[in-house]
Amino acid sequence: MIKTLAKNIKGFVKESVLTPFFMILEVIVETIIPFLMSSMIDDGINKGDMQHILITGGYMGALALTGLFAGMMGGIYGAKASAGFARNLRRSMFANIQSFSFANIDRYSTAGLVTRMTTDVTNLQNAYQMLLRMCFRAPVSLICAMAMTFIINARLACIYLIATILLSVVLAFIMNATYKYFSQVFEKYDELNASVQENVTSIRVVKAFVREKHEVGKFRKAADNVYRLFVKAENAMVTVSPIMMVTSYASIILVSWFGANMIVSSELTTGELTSMLTYCMNILMNLLMVAMVFVMLTMSLASGKRVAGVLNEKSTLANPENPVYEVKDGSIEFDNVSFSYNTKAEKPILNDINLKIKSGETIGIIGGTGSSKTSLVNLIARLYDVTEGSVKVGGKDVRDYDIETLRDKVSVVLQSNVLFSGTILDNLRWGNENATEEECVNACKLACADAFIESFPDKYNTKIEQGGTNVSGGQKQRLCIARALLKNPKILILDDSTSAVDTATDASIRKAFSENIPDTTKLIISQRVSSVSHADKIIVMDDGEISAVGTHEELIKNSPIYNEIYVAQTSGNGDFDAKGEL
């Protein structure tokens, strides 16, 4: 974990070195001042030597200014180093997340990743700043002060040594006891963020069903879980301060008592006792700093483990050593393919799939909910890797291609249509960042999106709100189809991507595809028979297997599942899911 996180110090090594340097300089200054103060009292004030007082006072003043400067510089460099460390962590995490396959993404919740990028990184930032400043300052100051007390009087110094050892043992015990609580706290933060995210993104549904009270209750429960665990952790940590105070006062009383007796017996001077008490406060303050560092490190250990987990996550998909950089054509072949999202699953999602599709063919895919239609097409763009068998595109196994090359030629319009903040043109150019406005317009005409775009006052410069909330479901689908077309793909996959458009528009899109992109292999997943009836071949999926393959006419005669869907839809009962699901 530490090695993974330490890589993100790059670019801020100078600041990370200068911070402890200035902190140690400040410690050295603070250690010398009480020693000079002892000399001022014994050799200056007690003897009435004004010259000694002025010279020693001048040295103390100069050292105080040096300590002030060192402390300020340490704070400045520490803040810069920790902020840079946090920035690098977020950049590294975000870049690694972008490389994740769908299988990697499935392991983390969206809220969990958000918590890691925000709360956990902030904890690490604070811990790193404290590490640079306190973790160097406190131990060095503690050792220096302890050494000076032994130089002044070894017997009195033993009181500090015993107190330090006892406090160290107690702090180690408390840190070990609270670590598990902070680990659980950050897991509950994931649930809290998930509750907020789900509510904000689905606020229209919440309002439509008048479920505000239910959502408030759900959020309150998540917030209470965080509260309870945090209180448990803090209940353990809160004992640190009282223990520190008791130890501090006990040490001061003991040193004062024994020191006074030593002064009476001429074993100790007044100046030496004053220095001992000053060093006592120095030692105890540094122990308090160490306690604060322990608290922060306890919290950051849990955060560090979570962040390092994301940084160390390797994509389940990787380019081969000598990848293929050209997709010959849009032909597709499934050869004895089986697939599971979970390798430990008893039954595969797809089982023994064998299928050949010629380049330029239009293929319809139909079947009931959960029949694995989407899982089938996800393998073509290598969004997932097969468990058994192979998938070939252009005569080559998809695992032999450079992933970027393959996905550039296999354009997928997913079930969940996503638009980003920006103009319509900005969204379209996700398909091809170098596309001209004319190319964007042509793609929109093919997707039957040009007409409604032209009706907007700003036309193609119309701003899309976050999530595309200012366009209808059908308009959003057509924009996503146009975006996919701008890639000039050899394979176009429409995963139920016209479900929100009317049948006339659906037919117009199909006609435009047939006339304008005849060489592109088109796979159309749909619940509507009318959307796939024109296809060269229709694949009927049932429970992860291919139930039947054929033309519309052939399947009406030979496939009970397809015939049932067709009859249900043409008889006016609406869209029909296989196996009698309406």
Feature map (PLM): residue ranges:
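Membrane-integrated ABC transporters
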Residues: M1-I33, M37, I45-Y59, M73-G78, ...
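Alpha-helical membrane-protein architecture signal
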Residues: I2, A6, K14-L18, R90, ...
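Transmembrane helices of ABC transporter permease
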Residues: G11, E15-I28, L63, F69, ...
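An intracellular "coupling" helix at the cytosolic face of ABC transporter transmembrane type-1 domains
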Residues: G11, S99-A103, T119-L132, F136, ...
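Juxtamembrane helix-loop junctions of ABC transporter transmembrane domains
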Residues: F21-F22, V29-D42, L63-T110, V114, ...
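Short intracellular "coupling" helices and adjacent cytoplasmic loop segments at the cytosolic face
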Residues: K47-G48, A83, R91-T115, T119-V121, ...
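Helix-loop-helix
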Residues: D49-I55, M148-I162, M175, K232-R306, ...
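ABC-type nucleotide-binding domain
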Residues: Y325-L582
